[in-house]
C-alpha cells in the first residue's frame, strides 16, 4: 500500500471511529458498537467469505483480496463463536509465537516497521492512535483497520481477534525485551469498523 493511500485510510477510519464510539453502549459488561447485535445467531460461512476491504481492495488486482481473506478465514476462523470461549488461549499463544519469530527472523526490525509489514501482507492497517508514558512503562492505543480476521463480520457482542492480540504481544516483547500486556477492547465482531488494542509495555 502506497503512503498516500495509507494516510487516506487512517484519516477515513479515524473520522468513522469518532461517530461509532459516541454511539456505543455497554452490554453484559462489554463495549458494543452501533451495528445491530446478532448475539444469538451463529456466524456462518456466508459471513466469513468474500468480505470487502475498501483500501486493500484497491491495492490488489483482479478481486484477489477477498479470496486472500477468505482463504485465511476458512483455515483460522472456522468456528469463531465456539472457539471464542475455549480456544482463545491457543490463538493468543500461536500469535505470540508468530510475532516473536517475525522479529527473530528479521521481518520486523523496529517498531516503525510493524505497520508496513501488516499492510504488505494484508493483515490490517495499523494506526498508532495514542502513546503515553505511564508509571513503570508505556501505554499504547493501537487500532487496526480492515483486519484480515474480523473485517465485515456481524456484531456478536465481543472481540474475537485473539490471534492478532498474540502477534502484537510477541512482536513488542521481542523488540523491547520487556513485559507486554495487550487486550482487544473494540472489534468488528463487537459492532465497530475497527479493532482497538490497549497495550502496556512495562519497564
Located regions from the model:
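Active-site helix/loop of acyl-thioester processing domains in fatty-acid/polyketide metabolism
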Residues: 161-177
Amino acid at each position: 500500500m502506497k503512503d498516500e493511500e495509507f494516510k487516506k485510510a487512517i484519516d477515513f477510519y479515524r473520522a468513522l471511529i469518532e461517530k461509532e464510539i459516541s454511539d456505543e453502549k455497554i452490554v453484559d459488561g462489554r463495549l458494543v458498537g452501533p451495528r445491530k447485535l446478532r448475539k444469538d445467531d451463529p456466524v456462518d460461512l456466508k459471513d466469513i467469505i468474500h468480505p470487502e476491504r475498501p483500501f486493500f481492495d484497491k491495492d490488489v488486482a483482479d478481486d484477489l483480496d477477498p479470496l486472500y481473506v477468505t482463504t485465511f478465514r476458512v483455515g483460522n476462523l472456522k468456528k469463531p463463536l465456539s472457539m471464542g470461549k475455549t480456544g482463545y488461549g491457543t490463538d493468543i499463544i500461536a500469535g505470540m509465537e508468530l510475532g516473536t519469530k517475525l522479529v527473530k527472523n528479521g521481518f520486523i526490525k523496529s517498531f516503525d516497521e510493524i505497520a508496513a509489514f501488516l499492510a504488505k501482507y494484508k493483515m490490517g492497517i495499523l494506526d498508532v492512535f495514542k502513546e503515553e508514558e505511564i508509571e513503570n512503562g508505556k501505554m499504547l492505543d493501537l487500532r487496526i483497520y480492515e483486519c484480515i480476521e474480523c473485517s465485515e463480520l456481524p456484531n456478536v457482542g465481543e472481540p474475537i481477534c485473539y490471534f492478532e492480540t498474540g502477534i502484537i504481544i510477541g512482536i513488542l516483547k521481542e523488540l523491547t525485551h520487556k513485559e507486554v500486556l495487550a487486550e482487544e477492547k473494540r472489534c468488528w465482531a463487537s459492532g465497530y469498523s475497527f479493532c482497538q488494542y490497549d497495550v502496556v509495555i512495562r519497564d
